[in-house]
């Protein structure tokens, strides 16, 4: 799909974009064939209006920041014009399967999302645009295919917040709202969020064709992913084993980044795991406030399968599911005639790759924690020092984000400067004991306090998308006041900067925030 960007007349951008999206679409995923997707128009969304818009993502797609103000923008990104598109240009929903909460769920698929096309980015990559909440598809099962305003605002804000934290993620171009009612635990209103990613292929796509005993389609999918996103794997002795290794590495490194900022995904089902190793499917997520290693952000996760401390283990388990799906392809290059012998070797090779997950995750997390503690030099006891801090935080339920941010104020020589971070701990003596160990470790560093603090503030955010901040923006948006969505999005674009005019966004959560619950109900 091509798109002509004319700087001469930005007013023509939206009509050109609409025409481009309505043209026959031949981008790479669609060339895999009808077994991978179903084409259909979006369900009409009544009287749509713009709730939020990312001019950064627009620029990434070569679109002007003025796009959202152009007539027809809300209609286009609600999916309404797709009813008039020709059959060969209709959006599509893809089919996949997966494990949900550790149990095989069988066929799933895009039950409320439609990909409307692909655009070239200004960074040389190509990006798919997907409307989440665009209505029922053949894969909706019992759902109505809609997303609600609250969950759409949360996904919009968190997608962009994670990007600015430096964590691989899908992006979000816009949120479109409507007064159209949808029934959840109560009556809510419908919304559509436009997600942007190089690909929305998930572990579950591979599981689907494996479970249906279609090695031909499984291979076509793997070849698509390798050729498009992992070209170096094509030159490996076994490209499909190399794909497993690359996806395992990226997944391990991604979850290490989650842990380092206190991010809980909430629903790490295999159908919510990106083959590109990016954060995808923002549902009942949350950033940990008062630190609890057993924190469960998803009210529906009664067993704590996806608790904060469990995320690395679950990610590893999900990679096992991906490996199982790829087994029919692994070893094909070796020319082993005996199927049983080839399968046995494939299992051995896959297990060897999976065994590298801890080797990828552990050092990645250690590097992140060393940076968060302002340690430029590497010492054997650094991981233990970081773990002891987390244990002390856990015991006192010290705020995760503020603890690491305020550690930058601690002096390697003067304990009297500990108060800002010390006051976050109920057990002050336990903190003092740890701080003495930390100061001893800092004495081995060559940087002075100011240089160390500056380095720490570049990796320890002051601003994250706390649940109560999102809730306040949602409450205003329900009253048709979208200023808080915009303001919060702007604050989260600069998570590491001091923003004196927005100091309240970095404060401890109010007492009422403890009663907020997020679940899979959206």
Swiss-Prot record:
Source taxon at top rank: Bacteria
Cofactor: Mg(2+); Mn(2+)
Residues involved in Mg(2+) binding: 272, 281
Catalytic EC class: transferase
Entry annotation: catalytic residues: 271 (proton acceptor)
Catalytic activity: L-seryl-[protein] + ATP = 3-O-(5'-adenylyl)-L-seryl-[protein] + diphosphate; L-threonyl-[protein] + ATP = 3-O-(5'-adenylyl)-L-threonyl-[protein] + diphosphate; L-tyrosyl-[protein] + ATP = O-(5'-adenylyl)-L-tyrosyl-[protein] + diphosphate; L-histidyl-[protein] + UTP = N(tele)-(5'-uridylyl)-L-histidyl-[protein] + diphosphate
Binding annotation for ATP: 109, 111-112, 132, 144-145, 195, 202, 281
Recorded GO MF terms: AMPylase activity; ATP binding; magnesium ion binding
Keywords, comma-separated and alphabetical: ATP-binding, Magnesium, Manganese, Metal-binding, Nucleotide-binding, Nucleotidyltransferase, Transferase
Intrachain S-S bonds: none
EC number(s) per entry: 2.7.7.-, 2.7.7.108
Function of the protein: Nucleotidyltransferase involved in the post-translational modification of proteins. It can catalyze the addition of adenosine monophosphate (AMP) or uridine monophosphate (UMP) to a protein, resulting in modifications known as AMPylation and UMPylation.
Family: Belongs to the SELO family.
PANTHER family: PROTEIN ADENYLYLTRANSFERASE SELO, MITOCHONDRIAL
HAMAP family, alphabetized: YdiU_SelO (MF_00692)
Protein name per the record: Protein nucleotidyltransferase YdiU
Gene: ydiU
